[in-house]
Amino acid sequence: MHYTNRKFWLFYNQLPEDIQKIADASYELLKTNPNHPSLHFKKVNKYWSVRVGKAYRALGIEVKNGILWFWIGTHDEYDRLISK
């Protein structure tokens, strides 16, 4: 199962509308086919990562019943977050 928190939606709402649409499509694909190669769904250090188009990523953490997605943003921001 995949979950989001309030913080995720704050980041999501700051995205351009076209990226929000890509994020929505990526989420639907993640629910039905997490192994789809376009998602690049993988564990990176302590986080789970999924691709949202070419220049955006989302990060989550593993929780009891699945993954809690807490962040979405640019690949540059993603690189900074995963390096911490």
What is the role of each PLM region?
Residues 14, 29, 64-66:
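A very general structural signal that marks isolated residues within well-ordered alpha-helical segments
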Residues 21-30, 76-84:
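Short, charge- and proline-biased low-complexity linear segments
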